[in-house]
Amino acid sequence: MQSISVLICVLLALSILNFTVASLTQRPIYAIAHRVLRNEAVTAALSHGANALEVDLTAWYFGWWADHDGKLFSAGSTARDLFKFIAQKQWTKDYNISFVWLDIKNPDFCRKGRPCSIEALRDLAREILEPAGIRVLYGFFETAESRGFKVIRDGLNSNEAVVLSGETSTILHLYNISGAGIPVKQMVMDFGDSWLRKGVDIYPELRYGSWKRDHGKLGKVFSWTSAQGDTEMVRYLLREAGIDGLIYGYQTDEYNDKSGPKSALKDIVDFVEAHSDTHRMATEDDAPW
């Protein structure tokens, strides 16, 4: 009887060991819902299975708004309201939100002390998102020389990371001259195109970025924007370029509960499930940085 108990313990230990080894050899993949600007888009993305959200943010004189275009009637929710809704979803434990990617359109619009300043945005994220266990990725597209970038860089905490967009050599140079003090794991790059299949040099740039990541020069490498019909490109980038995930959804429209985003997400999930020996969808147990 004792030998049976010992055998059971050994088998359980081996099972746990095998699971641990598998987890360490599988790349966690992030499916990042594109242009999530309203509560209903959050609900749709999470119900579809997204494990991260991309939110465009524009500063107006009276605060920050989820807004891609910065036009008179282009804004969605306020940043505060959207963050609160996202955090509420996470608190329910029904969803897996690893991080929110804040694509900041005008980081230097306001000076410190105003509700439209970069400090005010960071304070909102720390007040609402981070206590819910949601990490924050600050995106600076062609604004690595901005005051906003420097503020985020100089006050970065362990829940936060920075992402710069462009060719790998350019990104490495920018991090070298402007990213002093940022831990490598919190240096993220992205490269892509609104029309993924038509993008120029997407594969070689992402492959080079992944190679630099594997050699300790970058933390994560993402691409964008995978849409319905980009199946082969998604497979190629995940398999051959070795990226960590994609922004998916519509190329130029807000996320919604329709077939387009669902199909784009399915491309990512289907690849991961078909390559479970090397890939898995990231969960709350995976620290992206």
Swiss-Prot record:
Positions binding Mg(2+) in this chain are 54, 56, 103
Q: Does the keyword Secreted apply?
A: yes
Keywords assigned by UniProt, alphabetized = Hydrolase, Lipid degradation, Lipid metabolism, Magnesium, Metal-binding, Secreted, Signal, Virulence
The answer to whether the entry has keyword Mitochondrion is no
Compartments (UniProt record) = Secreted
MF GO annotations: metal ion binding; sphingomyelin phosphodiesterase D activity
Q: Which InterPro entries match?
A: PLC-like_Pdiesterase_TIM-brl, SMase_D/PLipase_D
Signal sequence interval, chain numbering: 1-22
This entry's comment on the bound cofactor is: Binds 1 Mg(2+) ion per subunit.
Alphabetical GO CC annotations of the entry are: extracellular region
Q: How is its activity regulated?
A: Sphingomyelinase activity is reduced by 33 percent following addition of EDTA.
Query: Where does the motif SMD-tail lie?
Result: 282-289
Task: Name the Enzyme Commission number(s) assigned to this protein.
Answer: 3.1.4.41
Cofactor(s) essential for the protein: Mg(2+)
First-level EC class:
hydrolase
Q: Which domain of life is it from?
A: Eukaryota
Primary location? secreted
The UniProt entry's GO biological process terms, in alphabetical order, are: lipid catabolic process
Q: Which reactions fall under this protein's catalytic activity?
A: a sphingomyelin + H2O = an N-acylsphing-4-enine 1-phosphate + choline + H(+)
Query: Where's the active site on this chain?
Result: 34
**General function of this protein:** Catalyzes the hydrolysis of sphingomyelin. Sphingomyelinases D are produced by some spider in their venoms, but also by arthropods such as ticks, or pathogenic bacteria and fungi. They might play a role in pathogenicity through different mechanisms, such as membrane destabilization and host cell penetration, but also pulmonary inflammation and cutaneous lesions.
Q: What is known of its domains?
A: The SMD-tail motif is highly conserved and may be responsible for structural stabilization.
Family that this chain belongs to = Belongs to the sphingomyelinase D/phospholipase D family.
Protein name, per record: Sphingomyelinase D
Read off the lineage from the record. Eukaryota, Fungi, Dikarya, Ascomycota, Pezizomycotina
